[in-house]
């Protein structure tokens, strides 16, 4: 029995964003590839319990998080200057979305609004270096 999977991509060449496909675990094949959301370099994605989609996103050369409805309509982008985020996670219990920016050493926190949009809440920046 096939499973529906979603995945983000790098979009420098032919790819256009976030895709859906059918995965057959018996054969290891993908079929019925479909673009569900156009977004620059959505390399990490996460879904909320309501089905809203959150992805690493970009807008006008800035990096951040993009939000989409359960049927993949764009809601909003929350972005800032500099390198794009590389990780996004949804905390449905606390109604928060977390993003990580390895280049800046940051963890960013966003509030999940009732309609699925995001608003920036806080950030923590790591100071220092490795061992």
Model-derived features with residue positions:
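Conserved beta-strand positions in repeat-built beta-propeller and related beta-rich domains
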Residues: 7-11, 55-59, 99-103
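Structural motif
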Residues: 14-19, 62-66, 106-110
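Residue-level detector of Asp-centered blade-edge/turn motifs that repeat once per structural unit
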Residues: 1, 47-50, 90-94
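WD40 beta-propeller blade-start loop/N-cap
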Residues: 37-38, 80
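Asp-box/WD-like beta-propeller blade repeats and closely related beta-sheet repeat scaffolds
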Residues: 72-131
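An edge-strand/N-cap motif at the start of beta-rich repeat modules
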Residues: 1-13, 17-22
């Amino acid at each position: 029995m096939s499973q529906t999977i979603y995945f983000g991509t790098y979009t420098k060449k032919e790819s256009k964003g976030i895709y859906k496909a059918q995965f057959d675990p018996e054969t290891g094949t993908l079929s019925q590839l479909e673009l569900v959301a156009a977004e620059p370099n959505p390399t990490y994605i996460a879904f909320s319990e309501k089905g809203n989609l959150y992805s690493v996103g970009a807008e006008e050369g800035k990096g951040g998080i993009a939000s989409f409805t359960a049927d993949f309509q764009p809601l909003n982008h929350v972005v800032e200057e500099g390198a794009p985020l590389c990780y996004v996670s949804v905390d449905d219990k606390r109604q928060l979305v977390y993003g990580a920016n390895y280049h800046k050493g940051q963890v960013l926190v966003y509030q999940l609004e009732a309609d699925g949009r995001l608003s920036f809440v806080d950030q923590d920046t790591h100071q220092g270096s490795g061992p």
